[in-house]
Amino acid sequence: MKALVLGGIGCVTVVDACVCSAADLGENYAVNASHVASGLPRCAAIIESLLGLNDNVSGSYVEDTLANILEKRAEFFEQFTLVVATQLREKEAMALDKVCRGFGVKALFVRSHGMVGVLRASVREHCIIESKPDHLPHDLRLSNPWPELSAFAESFRIGDGAKEYDLYEHMDDMTFKHVPYVVLLLHMLEQWKRTHDGEAPCTSADLRELKANIRAMLRKGDEENIREAVAAAHRLISPKPSSSSSSSPSSAATVPSEVAAVLNDPAARLGDTGTAVTNFWIIVSALREFVYGDGADDNGTSPGGGCMDTDSESESRISASSAGMGTRELPIDGSLPDMTSTTESYLALQEVYTAKAASDADAVYNIVRRKLAEMGRDDASISPVEVKHMCKHARCLQVVRHASLEEEMQPTDLKRGKIEQLLEDETTTSCTLFYLLLRAVDRAYESLNRYPGEFNEELENDISTLRSSAVSILGEYGLSQNLNLPLGLLDDYAKEVCRYGSAELHVVSAILGGIAAQESLKLILGQYIPIAGTYVFDAVHMLGATIAL
């Protein structure tokens, strides 16, 4: 919570029924000796310390147990954007998860147990506008330029257009070196179509020929814009329409597969899911119509399609045919990469892309307004700014839905295979064993009414109890206790976990707290993709792994 408050989270509420004790002094930085001496509720001490870190953050505390709140006033959790629960056992976590899902509230479960840390996000539906992929190429639309972009490229032409490279024939060397590579490629596309019966390049062989033609334009060998054009030549490649297609557009559009999955999600067909329609899905529905048109079938496409045979430089995408009035393209974001050019030419080109982005966003907003009217909602309930933001990041849209904790605990053949694979992989063996043993710890707690290993005189019995609980869990998945693990490995890990007792080590908690803060921001802001599954941190071997069941 310290990292969240320092980051300006806005408002926090701490729920805890305990009173500050001497044990907290070694485990919780927010508790000091004066808090212990005065018998202050631990939640009050934590809030006092947290709010002192950032004056812009407000906070409150509730002195109560989770069990009491769940039993008497579960609606308490409905007010929150995110519930972060720490140190809960399996049954407690499942009960809280069920309540949060019922209210559509995101939950994050964090647990530190000795040298092991566990983190699990649980969301019924998490809509991500800015997934921020590691590599997102600029959307320049060179294979299918719009009229204003073509006109911009045409403005560089010198001569009567009779010769193949007449654009550059009368340019001096300095002017030639500063022609933006976008213009070079657009003219190269025009020349290609002129000599290939109007067909656009669509194969790897075409790409190699294009690059050779571009390199042939070098004069002194130091033209950086030519090198940039060669590096971006793959952007001219277009999917080749199939022969069975009922229509043959000059350039089929492409939509990233992750985004296509969002556009084709049942929730994008407003009202089909039976749940309250959020602004996100209304705008996605408008984007779907913008791309595919209002005549798209259940898959978001009309008959026809194509494939693209290109080298690895090309972005992995799926083809989408036109339907109705669909543009077959996502709204352009309007951004430009750096390139060799004069300042005047670059700014003029930027204006062309900015104007196109604004035009696309306006078109989507008009669809949104129409849909709002059809739903009987005020068209001011979704602002043009919100639509523009989603259009700008249209290529980064994703939707995440996690299995509930209850579903995760239910054995299936698929989960059995995943556990076997994780245990056999040397990089994930230890984390998987710790994951299973922490579940076994909670089962052992039910019979012992304490954590295994809390009392030295009961250590051997606790090890046996914990091992039996772990074997029972493996048996539920139809797995032999030995599997393909080295002899005695499960016993060794059971002894290690029992050795922890109920210890909560500060160093492990600190690392896990940092990860939890990062995941919390992902869930609150709708940026980046949260961890899908249970993340296990093994501080013994300094390893981490995600167990997705």
Identify what each model region corresponds to.
Residues 1-549:
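Adenine nucleotide-associated cytosolic modules
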